[in-house]
């Protein structure tokens, strides 16, 4: 029926979602459909990345979605960044943190999105210490896209971020040991 395409925007509770609440990925994860992947960028989540970097490491740690909307966590010249592409309408960026020294590190991204389509905050820590923050004015209520995917260690398809669009798929040149994602139940 006419207008049926806006149903999920008005009723995000009807979105098809994975039954899982916890995932563990490695750098071989690619092209996982959004509706099967964790709800990163749409729900409250905790993402823990176990990685090894060299001086000036660059590349995508993970990306969900594409140029039409999505989220990405990436490194550029040794610094860590997070970007939230709200369907091209708005883009939200993390504050810039310090250069990360060579070695093994743990990055945690704690995303608080209390309700679909509402505002949110992504708090990023490095080895247990505050690193940067991304304030989201409006989160995507249902889905970023029906055709893009979740990737670890690269951003296949359309690039979530214009910062690395010309370098796509912007393969991570460090080592990703694991990316653990847990959904957080909102109160």
What positions do the PLM features span?
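Extracellular glycan-associated modules
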Residues: 1-187
């Amino acid at each position: 029926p006419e207008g049926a395409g806006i149903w999920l925007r008005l009723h995000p509770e009807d979105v098809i979602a994975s039954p899982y609440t916890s995932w563990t990925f490695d750098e071989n994860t690619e092209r996982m459909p959004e509706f099967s992947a964790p709800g990163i960028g749409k729900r409250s989540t905790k993402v823990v990345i176990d990685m090894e970097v060299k001086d000036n490491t660059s590349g995508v740690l993970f990306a969900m979605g594409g140029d039409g909307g999505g989220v990405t966590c990436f490194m550029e010249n040794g610094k860590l960044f997070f970007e939230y592409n709200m369907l091209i309408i708005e883009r939200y960026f993390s504050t810039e943190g310090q250069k990360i020294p060579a070695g093994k590190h743990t990055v945690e991204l704690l995303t608080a999105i209390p309700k679909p389509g509402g505002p949110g905050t992504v708090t990023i820590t490095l080895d247990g210490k505050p690193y940067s923050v991304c304030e989201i004015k409006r989160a995507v209520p249902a889905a970023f896209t029906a055709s893009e995917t979740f990737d670890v260690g690269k951003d296949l398809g359309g690039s979530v971020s214009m910062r690395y669009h010309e370098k796509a798929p912007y393969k991570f040149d460090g080592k990703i040991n694991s990316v653990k994602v847990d959904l957080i139940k909102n109160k």
